[in-house]
Amino acid sequence: MSLTLLPAVDVADGQAVRLVQGAAGSETAYGDPLDAALAWQRDGAEWIHLVDLDAAFGRGSNADLLADVVRQLDVRVELSGGVRDDESLRAALATGATRVNIGTAALEDPLWCDRVCGEYGDRVAIGLDVRGRTLSARGWTRDGGDLWEVLERLDRAGASRYVVTDITKDGTMRGPNLELLREVCARTNAPVIASGGVSTLADLRALAALEPAGVEGVIAGKALYAGAFTVAEALRTLADA
């Protein structure tokens, strides 16, 4: 089994964008989100990581656009951004997305989060967005508690997998935080998807080496948009690792 590659399409104001360290105002626009997602699909991606940044920041929604993107793709989609209650979770799943990420609500509404982990199982993943050892919420604009305390609670609730993002690395192309990923994998039996900082094929090989520890996938965004490598090259590298 090789690591799963999830090319990222982050959407703000109807456009595919990339941020640097999650900061609002640091966007670089890359055009139509559907075009980006279809390009990754054509290149062989079997998953797309689709994010509503406006919903994550609490400043709007691209829900209709994202639902349309999901409908037009033939591959699996992990949908993220602004899922904080039953209504938004049901709406996200109704798009046809294979999996929905819950971030802020896992920190701000633990009882609800614990319930949906048990109820929805594999269809829900928990986004752990980390700065140092502190979690961040609300589009990475607020502190959300201690990583290890929250991880322990979520494990007890039966979280099926974690998407772990080092915010200081995201969008910087400075390499992933391998130490953080090792630590998280050592403290949970749930699979981990790595996000943030991937910039080279060597980074993908380094992440593939963590597969025995529990890393099952990697989200790549900026590196693909910037042309550091293609989806096809990334898939080949992960298959050969």
Swiss-Prot record:
GO terms for cellular component: cytoplasm. Its main location: cytoplasm. It comes from the Bacteria. It catalyses: 1-(5-phospho-beta-D-ribosyl)-5-[(5-phospho-beta-D-ribosylamino)methylideneamino]imidazole-4-carboxamide = 5-[(5-phospho-1-deoxy-D-ribulos-1-ylimino)methylamino]-1-(5-phospho-beta-D-ribosyl)imidazole-4-carboxamide. It holds the Pfam family His_biosynth. The active site is at 10 (proton acceptor), 129 (proton donor). GO terms for biological process: L-histidine biosynthetic process; L-tryptophan biosynthetic process. The keyword Flavoprotein does not apply. GO terms for molecular function: 1-(5-phosphoribosyl)-5-[(5-phosphoribosylamino)methylideneamino]imidazole-4-carboxamide isomerase activity; phosphoribosylanthranilate isomerase activity. Pathway: Amino-acid biosynthesis; L-histidine biosynthesis; L-histidine from 5-phospho-alpha-D-ribose 1-diphosphate: step 4/9. CDD domains: HisA. It is an enzyme of class 5 (isomerase). Its EC number is 5.3.1.16. Keywords: Amino-acid biosynthesis, Cytoplasm, Histidine biosynthesis, Isomerase. It is found in: Cytoplasm. PANTHER family: 1-(5-PHOSPHORIBOSYL)-5-[(5-PHOSPHORIBOSYLAMINO)METHYLIDENEAMINO] IMIDAZOLE-4-CARBOXAMIDE ISOMERASE (PTHR43090:SF2). HAMAP family: HisA. Belongs to the HisA/HisF family. This is 1-(5-phosphoribosyl)-5-[(5-phosphoribosylamino)methylideneamino] imidazole-4-carboxamide isomerase. It comes from Salinispora arenicola (strain CNS-205). The gene is hisA.
